[in-house]
Amino acid sequence: MGRYNLLDEKWITVLRKDSGETENVSLLTLFEHAGEYRALAGEMEVQNFAILRVLLAVLTTVFTRVDATGEAYEWIELDDSDKLIVEEAVDEAYEDDFTEALEDTWKDIWESHCFPSVVCQYLKAWHDRFYLLDDKYPFFQVTKKDLVDRLPKGKNGTQFAGKQLNRMISESNNKEAIFAPVAGQGKSHMTEAELARWLITMQGYIGTADKAKFPKESKEKDSKGWLYDIGGIYMAGEDLFETLWMNTMLYHIEDDVRYTITPQSPCWEDIPSER
C-alpha cells in the first residue's frame, strides 16, 4: 500500500504573489494555481531547480501528446485513457506539421496564462506512480528487490541518512557538521515533504561515488545526475506559470527531428519489469 502521494500531499514550497508568504502545495494544486505563485521557494536554489525540472517533465510530456484543448495531435496515436500512452509516434515525414502544431499549443497556453485541465487529468491517471513510499512504484526510486536482484550476491546499495540527504546539514557518518541548523538525533529527522524535496535534489546532483555498484557484466551502469553533469540555466518570469511555460521546450529549435518526434518517457511511466 502506497503512502504519501505527491499529487495530493503538500510538499512543494512556493512563494505566494499576494501575501509574499511561503506555503507548501501539492503537485495538482501547483499546476491548477501556478499563476498565483511568484516562484518555487524551497530550502535552497539548487533544490528549486531540481524540482523545476520535474515540473517541466510533466508539461513536456503532456503537451507533446495533446494540444491546449486536450486533443491528441493528428500525427500521433494515443490510447483511449487519460494516461495519454503513445501507441504510435509521429512519422518523420510529418515533423514540420507537428512542430507547427506544437508552436500553436505553446502560444495558446501562454495567452491563457493558466495550464489546461488536461495536465491534472493526466497526473490523476498515473496516481499510483506518485507515492513517495510504495512497495511497487516508489517515486524517483527503485524497490529494494529491484536493486538487489541486479547486484552481486551479498552486496547492498548505499545507505543514506537524513543528515546526508538534507544539504542544509550535509553530514557524513564519519565527519560531524559542527554548525548545522539542528543538533543530535534531529539531524536525520525529516518530514515526508522534506524527504520528497531532498530526494529529487539528490537524484539531480548525485555523482557516481554514492551509487550502487553493478557487476561488470551487467547492462546497468552507474549513472550521475544530469544536473551534476551539465549544470543548468533557466528563465524566470513574473510568476511560476510564466517561469514554467517559458522553460517548457516542446520542440528543438535547431530542427533536431529526433528530439521533436520521439515520445517523452518520464520515470513515472516506467515499468520496472521492462527495464
Predicted segments with their positions:
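Conserved small-residue
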Residues: 1-275
